[in-house]
C-alpha cells in the first residue's frame, strides 16, 4: 500500500481525545423548534424565549436548521427573502443571543422528510448509486455550509436519525474530518435510540448522541417504581457501552408526550386526554433525576420549546404550567415564578385543530 494511503487511513481511524460536552456541570438543555421553517429563530422574540428557558435552570439550548430531502437524493435548502446565503440569520442569531445570556448552544441539522415519500428520517435510503452519490454530495455541501456559518456554536450534530446511511462509514468519516477543518467545537451524531450501537464512527466524535425515546416500561399504567427500574436497566446498558467505547452519552433529544404510551412508546405523537398527564409528569421527574445522577450521561436536550409568543406546539409540550416546574426543580432545586399565557395557548390550539398548516409533530 502506498505510504500516503497509510497516512490517510491512520488519520481517519486513529482515536483522539474527545472534547467534553459538560465541563463542570451537566448539560441541561432545551431544543427550540420552529412554527415554520426556522425563520422565527431570527426574531426578537428569541431573546425573551432564551430568558424564559434560562429561568428554568437551563445552560444549553439547541436549534435544528432544516433542509429538504427528495427520493432522488437531492438535498434542498430553503432561502428566506433577504437572508444571507452564506450565514442566514435564523442559523446565526440564536448563537449570538444564547452567548449573551451565558448559554451554550448546539446546532442540530434536520432533514425535513415530510412530503418526500419517506415516512421518517430512519427510512431515508436510495435505489441507485447515482442517487446515493447525489445525496452525499448535497448533504456534505449543506452540512459544511451550516458548520461554517455556525462555527461559533458550542456543539454541532452532523446527522440525525439517518439509520439507513450508517453502512456508508467512509462517507461519514470523510464528512466528520471535513467538518473538523472548519468547526472547532464539540461534534456528535444523533442516533435513533434503537440503533446507537450500530454507529461505526463514534471514535471520530466527541460523544455518543442518542435520541432518547427508549421504552422505559412495557405497560401503559406503570408505577414510579416501574419507571425507576426501567431507567436503572437502561442506565446500566448505556454505562457499559460508554465505558466500552470511551465516550459519554448525550441525549440529543429527550421527550415525553401527554400520552398513555409515554413510558412504553415515548416517540408516539398522539396527544391523549388529560388523564395521561400524571404519567407524562412522572416520566419527566424520573428521567431528569436519573440523568442528573449518572456520570456517564452528560445530559439532555429536552424536546421541545418554541419561540415566543407561542412557546408550545400540539405535542411534546414543555412550556406548560405543569411541566416547567418539574424541569426547574430537577435542574436547580427550586421552582421560580414562571408566567404562562394559558389563554393564548388554547386559542392557538383551537386554530391548529381547525386545520391550519401541517402537523407540528414533524421535526
Give the predicted meaning of each segment.
Residues 24, 41, 266, 279-284, ...:
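Aromatic-rich peripheral "rim/lid" segments of glycoside hydrolase catalytic domains that contact
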Residues 33-40, 74-88, 125-138, 159-166, ...:
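The substrate-binding groove and active-site-proximal loops of carbohydrate-active enzymes
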Residues 41-43, 50-56, 86-101, 124-155, ...:
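An active-site-proximal structural segment forming one wall of the substrate-binding cleft
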Residues 59-75, 88-165, 261, 305-308:
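Substrate-binding cleft and catalytic face of glycoside hydrolase catalytic domains
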Residues 86-88, 93, 101, 108, ...:
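Glycoside hydrolase catalytic-domain groove-lining segments
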